[in-house]
Amino acid sequence: CAMSLLKNTDSVLITTPDQGGHASIPIILEKLGVNYESIPYDYDNYQIDYKELNDLCKSGLYKFLIFCQSDIINPPDISKISLPDSMGIIYDGTQTLGLIAAGVLKNPLEYINNIVLIGGTHKTLPAPACGLIMTNCSNYQQQLQKNITPNYLRNTQPNHIAALLLALIEQENLGKSYQNLTVKIANQLAEELSELGFNIAKLKSNKYTYTHQLFILMNSLDTNDFYQTAENYNITLNKKHKRLFANDGIRIGTQEIARYNWNFSNVKMLAQLLYAIKNHNEKDILYYRNKLILLKTPAFTFEDISIK
């Protein structure tokens, strides 16, 4: 999208890596020669500083806002942004696309007329790996359609599109229950971990998260130790060293856990597993890990697909 909609004389505002923004965005913009500055951010609330942002939007200096958050427990509220007609938004919803589709989170396309919503299918929207581009602006649509194919992509695969459509139909039928459970489990797990002594990021609404993610805040040494111990038992986590995590911590996503339709007792077992990892208790790690592996049966999916 950036290659199709931006020129090297343009300036944009972005969510930076320290704010949870994807690390690739500054690199891409630098390669394109596009000037960028940070979107004002309130780290205490894990949220955009809308007053400062709206003041910057009034300046007329910027062509786009680019939201590209990989670490996100409190999504931006697009309805609070006062955007002049001369500006647009590129909203990378890769992490939350499934939550948006199910109505768990607000759909950015419904609040501002000149916006491009992009995302990948490997997070909360389970589907064959691919990207999706949506816009409510005919001008952006024409630029994207003209530039992306054939300038950047020439290998459209019909079988890939068919598989994506089946996955989207699956979410249309089963996604609302699945996506709501994803956020519910994230908050349940955060609460259980908090009771076990973990320092979990918490929002002022008394929730831990509005998404599938929760943040465990640790110092750098403990973060690296926790991550490595988990990896030793083939347990995948994301370690972070950035200001959003008070400098260091672990990010956990619950989208795959929710896909197994785990109940509260299963979530409590998962919390105990993470507690055992923290304390290097090999006996408990193996016990809870093996019990949870037996519960990994996919749900929220069609048992049979017949094409007539």
Please provide the spans of the model-predicted regions:
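Generic structural signal for hydrophobic core residues of well-folded globular domains
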Residues: L5, A167-Q171, M218, L274-N281
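Short hydrophobic/aromatic beta-strand micro-patches
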Residues: M134, F215-N219, G253-Q255
